[in-house]
């Protein structure tokens, strides 16, 4: 399923390009149990520093290790991002320079308005990918801002791609656990 970018006349909006099967979603969630994928503190970028700020971002995260047993996931993400980029964005992209990150938002977890494009490693992010992995939670909506807040009706396994400069947030999870996978396709800096 490919949905054209939503809500922008320039075509650089949010798009759903695919849906992965539930067994793949479960396999990705289970990656947090493997010690090769380290749990890391979730940080927020402020100017040129990264800090822990639970008022802005409250989530647990696991970095998916750059090891052969995880190559299938990297290949899948790169293929999907290339598809979205060729169809809609037409950015100069090179690949996945940063490792994908598995996120768990428990009750009261959230991430306030932000963009994925920043300084340091984040300065070359072009296409952001978000894949919700489950539906057993309340709240936690993925919202985008473009001349007003837009909530997407998305389900587990939907592959959401958007330019990394688009502001977005995850609203507060009211109950349950919200699992998602995020990744960023990089390229030369925007001009």
Regions found by a protein language model. Name each.
Residues 1-159, 165-191:
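Fe(II)/2-oxoglutarate oxygenase catalytic core
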């Amino acid at each position: 399923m490919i949905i054209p970018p939503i809500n922008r006349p320039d075509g650089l909006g949010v798009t759903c390009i695919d849906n992965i099967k539930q067994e793949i979603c479960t396999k990705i969630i289970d990656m947090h149990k493997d010690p090769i994928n380290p749990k890391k503190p979730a940080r927020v970028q402020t100017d040129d520093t990264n800090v822990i700020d639970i008022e802005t971002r409250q989530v647990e995260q696991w970095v998916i290790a750059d090891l052969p047993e995880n190559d299938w996931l990297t290949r899948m993400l790169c293929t999907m991002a290339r598809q979205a980029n060729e169809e809609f964005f037409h950015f100069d992209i090179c690949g996945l320079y940063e490792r994908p990150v598995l996120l768990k938002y428990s009750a009261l977890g959230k991430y306030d308005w932000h963009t994925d494009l920043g300084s340091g490693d984040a300065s070359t992010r072009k296409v952001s990918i978000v894949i919700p992995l489950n539906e057993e939670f309340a709240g936690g909506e993925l919202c985008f801002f473009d001349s007003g807040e837009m909530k997407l009706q998305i389900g587990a396994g939907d592959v959401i791609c958007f330019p990394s400069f688009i502001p977005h947030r995850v609203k507060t999870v009211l109950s349950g656990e919200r699992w998602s996978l995020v990744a960023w396709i990089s390229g030369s800096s925007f001009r």
